[in-house]
Amino acid sequence: MGLVVMFIASWLAIFIFYSFQERLTILENAFVFLVSLTLVINASWIIAEELKLVELTKDGVAYTGFILNRSVGVPMIFVIAMNAVFRAKRVWTALASVAVVLAALVGLNGLGVYFEIAKYEKWNLGYDAISYAALLAIVYGLLRLYRKTVYRRTPS
């Protein structure tokens, strides 16, 4: 059941992104996706495999749900978040968008725990929220740096 839930969540993230009026260019969206994919994979590896704070399931089907969520769902949600943040005209709107995204990400992890995809040993959903907030801040900073570098005027 965990695979089905994570598949639907990933599919829903892709559909929302597709129907969302994009603020970022296709290159910026690809940059955000690839950077967030790299960060999320590394963070989940460190948390689960190196520090042993989370125990992942040994069931192959449920583990496929984890991989699908980690490799497609979460990076697509990060892309949606960056589009929403850069589209916001006010700071409060951007912060509300980030809060909704954090709630969705923590909710997905909560579903992962409920369907026994992951078992929290020395970890909880609050730590998930903090780590996702840090990852969102890093992606935001890297995207700002990318935009500054790409759109810099060259002297003529």
Residue spans for each PLM region:
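Aromatic-rich, lipid-facing transmembrane alpha helices and their immediate juxtamembrane interface loops
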Residues: 1-156
